[in-house]
Amino acid sequence: MRNVRRVAVGATPSGFMGSRRKAALGAPVLNLMCGTALVAGLTFCVQDAWAQDWVPELQAATGETHGRNDPIVIILPDDLDPAVYPRLAVELDDIDVTAFAVTAPGQLTLNPPEALSTGEHVVRLVERGEDGSIVERGAWFLEVRHSELIRDLSVRADLAGEVNARVLDGGIDTPPQHVTAESGGNLEAAAGDENWRVSLQGNYLYNSQLELGLNERNIDLGEYRLDGDYENEDFFAGLTAGNHDTGIESLIMSGFNRRGVSVRAGTADERISATGFMLRTESIVGTRHVLGISHDEDRIEGGSISVRPIEALKDNILLTGIYYNGEGSDGGFGIGTDEVINDGDGWSVAADTLWFDEALRVRGEFAEATFDFDGKDTGFAPETANAYSVLASLEPLRGSTLGGSTFNWTFGAQREQVDTFFQSLANPSLQADRETTSVFTDFFWDEFAAQLRVDHQLSNVDDFDFLPTDRTVNAYFNGTYTPFVEPLEDGSLPWFGQPFFGLTASVTDIERVETSSDFPEDDADNQSRSLTLSTGSNYATWSWNLSHTLYTFEDQTGFSSDSINNTTGLSAYILIDDWLTLSPNVQYDVFEDRDLLKTSRTINAGLSADITVIPETLTASLNYNLNVRTGDGDTPDSSSFGGEVVWTLREPDANKLGVALAFNGFLQETRNDDFESLEDDVQYQAFTTLRLSLPVSY
């Protein structure tokens, strides 16, 4: 074991701003750092005879701050023996970077191979002894900043565009322009310091064909999001503008990603937090409504507050209240025109609790919503309805292991009731008029995973005579098994590879418990069942996957035909060589109408190939698809062939434009011998393309 001697460092390193650290690391910090790549695992001993006591210093930054690309200069004593220089090594963030250091009389200059990230870095200088021992001469914290005001600054963008020239076509309607262009890109920018951060995300779309452009414009903004956050030891605050989801999840507001503005604030320990929002009701993109909240008739506003009332149980009990009101035209009952404006409001209160080391979760929520279905200030009065949800889940063996592997098992129950006329502008996808009781369990252990859920649902919650009452029972199961396979002595897999197995099954039973007074003859009694079996295996250079799905539908009322559907699919991925990969697939489908005694069969087959002619320069991709239908209700067969050849003139790299030329096209043939069709049997197109791409990074 080599010996290491640690020399006391008494120098004062420079290069830190304001009240940043101004001294070399003392003994406690050095003890913390000693587990690095150069020092870890080595023992300490008394001072070696070859080692001299000398102290280096870190040179101050030449400007106001130490920039990302600035060299790191370590000042060496003037009287240091030049024979020591070859024995010096530099470490940056636990990585030996001596190869990038240059020594000169009185100093050592490190030029990092790439720009340093902003933030705090650790620089360490060590001296190697002839006997293999190591002396740590100095260690410093170095803060890298963009400027005195901004510590972190980054800009990233992925820009891509292409110009297409149609050189060949037939049997298909084509636009008059033979040369078209399109482009798209994503942008991310961020700036911040220790307590604050501002970030921007956005994208754009361009199309030379006006009719295909976003909002009938050649170029326009897609979606964007602007965030600003501040946090200190006592509180946090933030603002978001653009397309975003406030993160509020409740019966009256869920998954509501819209354009608008929201603010948030709370205590640093998150015992109290609040969110206020003003969002557009409909989803929009583009620059026509930049903030999205300019129209009163298409906007909701409100807020939420969350409290952890008991300090001793602040991680266990969370109380949340939400309120909103507004107007919009997507109420969810087929109302989607500008002429009909629905208004509504709603509120909810919820309690979410965790017990027994978070093994038991109990959550309850009650909500009330008012909604004017036939339009604001017209027709009938608004409807007010309620909804509630109760959830309990238990993970009895939380954190346990079985056979040396993590074992997770969760089971629970949920009760949810949503009144017949419950409707929220901020949660338009919520299914109303249902009373649902569910039980579920999730299981994961080593090679096994399974999920099981059973739902019992009743409709016509408010017992209206003019509505029927239906009972729906749904059961769902999904399970996977991936056994561990020990590689052979040569590192390869056995003949059966790395197999995997899966099973998915579902059953849905719908029964009409009580008919409506308006349509007493209408009945409902049907069952649908689905079973999917899948298996496959992975090898070093290829893989395969086989699946079969059986679906049956039975209608006891005779309103719909009983049917059976069998679908079998087989696919593979084969790496023939470094220059060729093949992806074949075939699917066989049989559909039987048991009432009409008709059967139809469909075969879909395909083959894709990726070819590398010259690595990173010339590539090609080809694909062939065949669709054959037989039996009752026979329809035309079709086949298609497509492909592309790409010649890369210059690979895209950070802040460097990538250029490529491509030739692509397709040919489709439809066999219409027994059918009359307005379209040609053979359709084809071919293009030459110039592609440009530019990844930007700063």
Where do the PLM segments sit?
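Aromatic sugar-binding surface patches on proteins
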Residues: 103-110
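Short edge beta-strand/loop segments characteristic of extracellular beta-sandwich folds
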Residues: 71-79
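Solvent-exposed loop/turn segments flanking beta-strands in beta-repeat/beta-sandwich domains
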Residues: 80-88
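N-terminal secretory signal peptides that target proteins for export/translocation
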Residues: 1-26
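Outer-membrane beta-barrel "beta-signal"
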Residues: 682-698
